[in-house]
């Protein structure tokens, strides 16, 4: 059975709740087992992903996953912090995804305000958590179609 790791940034709990609910619903519908790793904010997502990959490389079977989903949110504020954190988060996730041939769905929101975040995280609305899970599942299928192991 396939197994996926959801790495979730909980900086905005009420937004993270919606993203996680959407992702979990998609994996449950697909019959895919999923674990959860929680980090403080989106800046920590790439580091957490790299730690999991390192643990798997060092033989930790509990750290072996067929796919990954990253979830979190950055909301623009009064300073440039949002831009720097969002850029580094996305770069780090993309770099690891390509370097390790990961089946990964990215559900990190970078939005201008809370209303945008709520609309995108709500499973009954834009459901970006669910979209990230579906992207992960599709990339897992692509790897299988190409004969690549997890």
Swiss-Prot record:
<feature type="binding site">
    <location>
        <begin position="42"/>
        <end position="44"/>
    </location>
    <ligand>
        <name>5-amino-6-(D-ribitylamino)uracil</name>
    </ligand>
</feature>
<keyword id="KW-0686">Riboflavin biosynthesis</keyword>
<dbReference type="InterPro" id="IPR034964">
    <property type="entry name" value="LS"/>
</dbReference>
<dbReference type="InterPro" id="IPR036467">
    <property type="entry name" value="LS/RS_sf"/>
</dbReference>
<keyword id="KW-0808">Transferase</keyword>
<feature type="binding site">
    <location>
        <begin position="73"/>
        <end position="75"/>
    </location>
    <ligand>
        <name>5-amino-6-(D-ribitylamino)uracil</name>
    </ligand>
</feature>
<dbReference type="GO" id="GO:0009349">
    <property type="term" value="C:riboflavin synthase complex"/>
</dbReference>
<dbReference type="Pfam" id="PF00885">
    <property type="entry name" value="DMRL_synthase"/>
</dbReference>
<dbReference type="GO" id="GO:0005829">
    <property type="term" value="C:cytosol"/>
</dbReference>
<feature type="binding site">
    <location>
        <position position="120"/>
    </location>
    <ligand>
        <name>(2S)-2-hydroxy-3-oxobutyl phosphate</name>
    </ligand>
</feature>
<feature type="binding site">
    <location>
        <position position="106"/>
    </location>
    <ligand>
        <name>5-amino-6-(D-ribitylamino)uracil</name>
    </ligand>
</feature>
<dbReference type="GO" id="GO:0009231">
    <property type="term" value="P:riboflavin biosynthetic process"/>
</dbReference>
<protein>
    <recommendedName>
        <fullName>6,7-dimethyl-8-ribityllumazine synthase</fullName>
        <ecNumber>2.5.1.78</ecNumber>
    </recommendedName>
</protein>
<comment type="function">
    <text>Catalyzes the formation of 6,7-dimethyl-8-ribityllumazine by condensation of 5-amino-6-(D-ribitylamino)uracil with 3,4-dihydroxy-2-butanone 4-phosphate. This is the penultimate step in the biosynthesis of riboflavin.</text>
</comment>
<comment type="pathway">
    <text>Cofactor biosynthesis; riboflavin biosynthesis; riboflavin from 2-hydroxy-3-oxobutyl phosphate and 5-amino-6-(D-ribitylamino)uracil: step 1/2.</text>
</comment>
<feature type="active site" description="Proton donor">
    <location>
        <position position="81"/>
    </location>
</feature>
<feature type="binding site">
    <location>
        <position position="11"/>
    </location>
    <ligand>
        <name>5-amino-6-(D-ribitylamino)uracil</name>
    </ligand>
</feature>
<dbReference type="InterPro" id="IPR002180">
    <property type="entry name" value="LS/RS"/>
</dbReference>
<comment type="similarity">
    <text>Belongs to the DMRL synthase family.</text>
</comment>
<feature type="binding site">
    <location>
        <begin position="78"/>
        <end position="79"/>
    </location>
    <ligand>
        <name>(2S)-2-hydroxy-3-oxobutyl phosphate</name>
    </ligand>
</feature>
<dbReference type="GO" id="GO:0000906">
    <property type="term" value="F:6,7-dimethyl-8-ribityllumazine synthase activity"/>
</dbReference>
């Amino acid at each position: 059975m396939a197994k996926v790791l959801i790495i979730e940034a909980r900086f905005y709990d009420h937004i993270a709740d919606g993203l996680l609910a959407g992702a979990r619903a998609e994996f449950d519908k697909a019959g895919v087992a999923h674990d959860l790793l929680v980090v403080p904010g989106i800046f920590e997502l790439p580091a957490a992903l790299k730690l999991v990959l390192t643990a798997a490389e060092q033989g930790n079977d509990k750290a072996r996953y067929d796919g990954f989903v990253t979830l979190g949110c950055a909301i623009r504020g009064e300073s440039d912090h949002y831009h720097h954190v969002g850029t580094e988060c996305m770069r780090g996730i993309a770099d690891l995804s390509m370097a390790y041939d990961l089946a990964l769905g990215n559900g990190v929101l970078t939005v201008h305000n809370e209303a945008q975040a709520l609309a995108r995280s709500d499973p009954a609305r834009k459901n970006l958590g669910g979209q990230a899970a579906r992207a992960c599942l599709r990339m897992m299928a692509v790897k299988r179609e190409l004969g690549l192991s997890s």
